[in-house]
Amino acid sequence: MVYSIALAVLIAYFLGNFNGAVLVSAMMHDDVRSHGSGNAGLTNFVRNFGAGRALYVIAIDMGKAILACEASRLILSPYGFSIDGTALGALCVILGHTFPILLGFKGGKGILSGVTVALMMDWRIGLFVFGIFLVAYFLTGYVSLGSVLSSGSFGFIYAWVHWGEGIFPILVGLLLSGLIVWMHRANISRLVKGEERKTNLFSKGTDK
């Protein structure tokens, strides 16, 4: 079983290393990290390359999260750890996305893949926190605010709904919430100071 856990961890982590924004911009003979905020994430990509091309980024980042959770679940389900397997895959793919060894440990902030793993762990809660993101974004125009509120609430809602059903997925949910909020610490500081930049997620971008 130890080897199975190690295999699940490695698969999920290295899937997380495949950063959609970096890959798609590389296909365009460019690097999203050399533009704007320098972040390898969806928001910076949209600002500079547009919403149309961002669909490929979304497909990659959501796809890798789904694959990681499913692979981990399938590997560990023979041992009776189906839900724990999904949670392990969720944790490792987000760690791979935010701290990718193949990209010098400089990845994205994990919100897109984070919403996806939330859906994989519990689709009802995933949809709810995605709704929180949408409401916050459309009311304020701040992607970061929606990201912090939605990701920050996931772990606590998951713990409340699934309390008593197993500690590992609950711990993973709380860890993911804390990690993604921490990845947005600079955004939180700018929000408090009134310096955060609003983002049009339907923008055509600045680079043609």
PLM feature spans:
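Loop-to-transmembrane alpha-helix initiation sites
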Residues: 127, 143-150, 165-176
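C-terminal ends of transmembrane helices
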Residues: 21-25, 96-106, 133-140, 185-189
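A cytosolic-side transmembrane-helix exit/cap motif
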Residues: 105-109, 130-134, 167-173, 190-196
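Helix-coil boundary and interhelical linker segments in multi-pass alpha-helical membrane proteins
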Residues: 1-7, 69-88, 119-125, 159-172
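Interfacial segments of multi-pass membrane proteins
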Residues: 44-51, 72-75, 92, 96, ...
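Alpha-helical transmembrane segments in multi-pass membrane proteins
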Residues: 4, 8, 12, 17, ...
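Short, non-helical or kinked segments that cap or interrupt transmembrane helices
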Residues: 31-42, 102-115, 142-150
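Cytosolic, membrane-interface loops and tails of multi-pass inner-membrane proteins
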Residues: 22-54, 189-208
